[in-house]
A protein has these predicted regions:
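Bacterial N-terminal signal peptides that target proteins for export
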Residues: 1-10
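Residue-level signal for mature regions of secreted extracellular proteins and peptides
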Residues: 14-15, 222
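C-terminal motif of bacterial Sec signal peptides marking the signal peptidase cleavage site
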Residues: 17-20
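N-terminal pro-sequences and low-complexity stem/linker regions of secreted or lumenal proteins
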Residues: 22-465
Length: 465
């Protein structure tokens, strides 16, 4: 069965209604955020959440020198062997965002780097493709000037410096975590790492594709998991619920903006809902909620047809993913934030920006305590742009991806999915809903909104690990 067509119709959340001030370059018309549509009452002034998912960067890789944040330009490496092994400091190298390196960031490399919480063995990770040692390559941080839009959002709005990804693994499971908070397929096993597919990961994968699992006793079972489609999971995936199930039950509108999947590609991530059989197999469900290309989010903001909940998965060239040699990710994020800020959606919206996994790069803060699902993983950055966050707020609260899921559930008074959302601290403490909605401040960027609206899709997978 081929991938279903992407979204044509658009549904709305309720809206609030004051125009934001300020003139962004390529400012969009203020969409009619009060247009009638399906709506479910919210617990906060927020009636729209946009979750932007960038790729493969630790917190320290992007914010090593951000004032007031828990970052560093010095790491630790383990040298020597046996009794001669010793921990020594190593200066992190400042690099370009468009660097060509793509490092190993699967579960085994996470365990090596973690080294029982000492965070000193990133230099012992080996490339997954060649088996050669990566050496000092993980010990880097990006030149702040090249991620200035991220720093501006953090300065004008809010940054979290202790958000840990759900598992110490790669993008396949990380994107599942961002729609449901975990990858448990039964009471003792969770998915981890990548499927063995030679095409897009999910229900479109070729027959015989396997996933990998980790047990609650932390036994890693490589290539012993089910086909990456929920109808092949234990109990036909009946317990593998996502936020989409909660939204549909409560009549909350949602869309997942992502590159269109292709049937002819190497094993790769395109869309987290390709794994979710009830969404993938239902033509009307897919066409209503899955929207391609990602720039459709800009169009929906302009047209006043933004749903209550949006996930935004970028084109590979706009994702910050190492190896694609592109510097466009920060501008892509800024273009969406600026579009919201120039529209009537601003006073009712929270834009949350996260990086899905650690990408194999150094980070100094050990996740603790470890759980029974191969996590928590290493720190990744989280930005929040909203009229209800104080300027230049840095949250040092320990969060996980379940914290974002929990905040989404709280916003629309939804029940818990029963994954990591249950034990995680909600990100609601980053907001001050008693303050008057702040006027929007434009985020300057190298590439304007018009660039992305005219950008030719790369046709590349968002991630292959």
């Amino acid at each position: 069965m081929k991938t279903p067509p992407y979204l044509v119709a658009a549904l709305l959340g309720t809206a609030v209604a004051l125009s934001a001030c300020g003139g962004a370059s390529n400012a969009v018309p203020s969409g009619n955020a009060a247009t009638s549509a399906r709506h479910h009452s919210t617990a906060y002034p927020i009636t729209h959440i946009i979750l932007m998912v960038q790729e493969n960067r630790t917190f320290n890789d992007l914010f090593a020198t951000f004032p007031g944040a828990d970052g560093t330009t010095t790491g630790l490496e383990l040298t020597g062997k046996g009794k001669k092994a010793k921990q020594v400091p190593i200066n992190l190298t400042e690099v370009n965002l468009a660097d060509k390196k793509d490092l190993n960031h699967l579960y085994n490399s996470y365990k090596i780097a973690y080294d029982h919480g000492k965070m000193d063995s990133f230099n012992h990770i080996k490339f997954s493709t060649t088996g050669q040692n990566e050496g000092a390559l993980p010990y880097q941080y990006v030149n702040p000037a090249q991620v200035q839009p991220y720093w501006t959002i953090a300065t004008d709005y809010a940054l979290a410096d202790h958000l840990f990804q759900t598992q110490g693994s790669g993008s396949f499971t990380a994107h599942q975590d961002l729609i449901r908070g975990g990858t448990e397929i039964d009471s003792t096993e969770s998915l981890i790492d990548d499927p063995t597919s030679s095409s897009a990961w999910g229900c479109t994968s070729p027959p015989g594709t396997k996933t990998s699992k980790i047990t609650t006793s932390l036994h890693f079972e490589a290539r012993e998991g089910p086909f990456p489609c929920t109808n092949q999971f234990p109990s036909s995936g009946s317990s593998y619920k996502t936020l989409a199930d909660l939204f549909d039950s409560a009549s909350v509108s949602w869309k997942y903006y992502a590159p269109p999947p292709t049937d002819f590609t190497t094993g790769a991530l395109w869309n987290a809902f390709l794994v979710i059989y009830p969404v993938w197999s239902n033509k009307s469900e897919w066409s209503e909620h899955i929207s391609s290309p990602p720039t459709n989010v800009l169009t929906d903001i302009t047209n006043g047809t933004l749903p209550a909940m949006s996930w935004v998965i970028p084109d590979a060239m706009n994702s910050d993913h190492p190896g694609y040699k592109s510097d466009k990710g920060p501008s892509w994020v800024a273009s969406v934030v600026n579009a919201v800020g120039a529209s009537s959606y601003w006073n009712s919206t929270a834009v949350i920006v996260v990086w899905d996994d650690w990408g194999g790069f150094y980070d100094s803060v050990a996740p603790s305590p470890l759980d029974t699902q191969g996590g928590p993983g290493f720190r990744v950055g989280m930005l929040v742009a909203s009229p209800y966050v104080p300027p230049n707020e840095i949250s040092h609260t320990v969060y996980g991806f379940g914290s974002i899921i929990k905040f989404i559930e709280e916003t629309w008074n939804l029940p818990s999915l029963g994954t990591t959302d249950q034990s995680s601290t909600s990100i609601v403490n980053m907001f001050n809903f008693t303050q008057k909605a702040r006027k929007f401040k434009v985020i300057p960027s190298k590439y304007a909104r018009s660039f992305f609206l005219h950008q030719k899709p790369s046709g590349l997978p968002v991630d292959t690990e």
